[in-house]
A protein has these predicted regions:
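Short runs within selected transmembrane alpha-helices of multi-pass transporters and secretion channels
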Residues: 20, 27, 31-35, 96-146, ...
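Hydrophobic alpha-helical transmembrane segments of multipass membrane transporters and ion channels
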Residues: 22, 62-70, 103, 192, ...
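Transmembrane alpha-helical segments of multi-pass transport proteins
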Residues: 134-137, 148, 185-215
């Protein structure tokens, strides 16, 4: 918000904060769900084989996808009419910005299962410097892109830094150190889940756009 306020204007920063208020609220709900699973998964890893733990991780990963695809689709479809009702027409972002916010929420949320395993296994050492690298990339790109692209530039910086660092490093670390297996299957599932989520979003948006207006 500080970069947006300095690089764009205070009004846009305020509108952005309203959108992120919804996103953070959804994240708080999902965090409560996954935080409740940490101890159980940690106990599972200590009492079962790596193969059994990996099979349970795949179930958890699918559960992760179900939650975040549902919330992402709901946010994208409902966000504009909700913000129009709540804040008025002057507080709406264009569809491109809403799409970037939705993508940021989805990609960040799809890390929940990986983060849960890392926390349960207590694996922090291999990952200790990557957050600093991600932050440096994010900040540098945001400062470069905010002038030509505005808020979209800040969101693109968030997505690029997330994609360049934790998208690759965190899954690799847990698959190598916890499950002792390759990471290829993880990314294949990720692509399939993303494709299904995108199709579901487009279908939902199409259906909602053809519903008769209320009132």
């Amino acid at each position: 918000s500080m970069i947006i306020a300095r690089g764009v204007d205070l009004i846009s920063a305020g509108i952005y904060s309203n959108y992120m208020l919804i996103v953070n609220g959804l994240n708080n709900i999902t965090n409560q769900v996954f935080n409740g699973i940490v101890a159980s998964f940690g106990n599972l890893m200590s009492t079962s084989t790596r193969e059994k733990a990996y099979e349970n991780f795949k179930v958890l990963y699918f559960f992760n996808y179900l939650i975040y695809s549902f919330f992402s689709i709901s946010f994208f479809v409902i966000c504009v009419p909700f913000m129009k009702l709540w804040m008025g027409n002057d507080s709406l972002f264009p569809i491109a910005t809403v799409s970037l916010i939705t993508l940021y929420f989805y990609i960040g949320g799809m890390r929940q299962a990986v983060n849960l395993v890392r926390t349960s296994a207590g694996i922090y050492q291999p990952d200790q410097y990557f957050p600093l690298i991600e932050t440096a990339i994010n900040l540098g790109l945001a400062l470069i892109l905010v002038k030509p692209l505005g808020i979209n530039g800040v969101l693109v910086a968030n997505l690029v830094s997330m994609f360049l660092v934790p998208f690759w490093t965190q899954p690799y670390i847990i698959h190598k150190n916890v499950f002792d297996t390759g990471v290829k299957n993880y990314y294949l599932r990720y692509c399939v889940y993303a494709a299904v989520a995108l199709f579901s979003l487009l279908l939902t948006q199409f259906i909602c756009s053809h519903l008769p207006a209320m009132g």
